[in-house]
Amino acid sequence: MSLYEKLIAKEAVLAVVGLGYVGMPIAVAFAKKGLNVIGFDTNSKKIEAYRSGADPTKEVGDEQVRNTTVQFTDEEQQLRKADFIVVAVPTPVNFDHTPDLTPVIGASEIVGRNLKKGAIVVYESTVYPGCTENVCIPILEKGSGMVCGTDFKIGYSPERINPGDKAHRLENIRKIVSGMDEESLEEIQHIYDIVIEVGTYPVSDRKSVV
C-alpha cells in the first residue's frame, strides 16, 4: 500500500510544520478531505487561538477553524507520528536582501529529531537553489541519525499563496511538485492532488528539489 493510500485510509498521518498564512490553509484543506492531520507551530499563543476557533491569519476563517479536525499542537514530539511532513515556515529577508534561513533551520532541527523512518518531508518554504541539499538535508540527517534517500525522502513544492487573495486559493492554483526520486515524486504528486483541484505539475529533474 502506498503512502497516498495509507493517508486516504487514515492509516498514516500528515503533519504541517508552521501554521501561518501558508501552512494553515494546507492543514485545513487536507483535514477537510478526511486525512489525519497534525498542525504544529512553536507559537503557543497561536495554537491556543486555533484551538479556541479563531484564525489569526485570516486565511481560513474562524468558522473553518472551529470545524476542522486538525490536531493543533506546540509539542514537537507529536511529529513522531507523521509519515508525510510539510514544512511551511516563513523565509524573511535580511536587511542586505539575503534570505533569513533561521525559521527553516529551526523547523528542520525540530523535524529531524522527531523524524519517523520512511517519512517524506516536503519543503514549501521559499529557499534558494541548493538550500535543501546543502542546509536542510544535513540537519535532518544529524537530528534523526538516518540517511536521506534510504531512511526518509525529501521533496519540494514552492508555496504560491498570496496572503489576503480570496480569488486565488490553495485549491485553484496549479502547484509545482518535485521529489528526490521517481518514487517520492509520485507519492508527493498523488498526495497534493487530494487538495489541489486544478492539478499539480510534476518536475522530475532532481536539481529542482535541491
Predicted features along the sequence, with ranges:
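Alpha-helix C-terminal capping/helix-to-coil transition sites in glycosyltransferase folds
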Residues: 80-81, 117, 172
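Internal alpha-helical scaffold of NAD(P)-dependent oxidoreductase catalytic cores
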Residues: 138-156, 161-210
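Rossmann-like NAD(P)(H) cofactor-binding subdomain of soluble oxidoreductases
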Residues: 77, 93-160
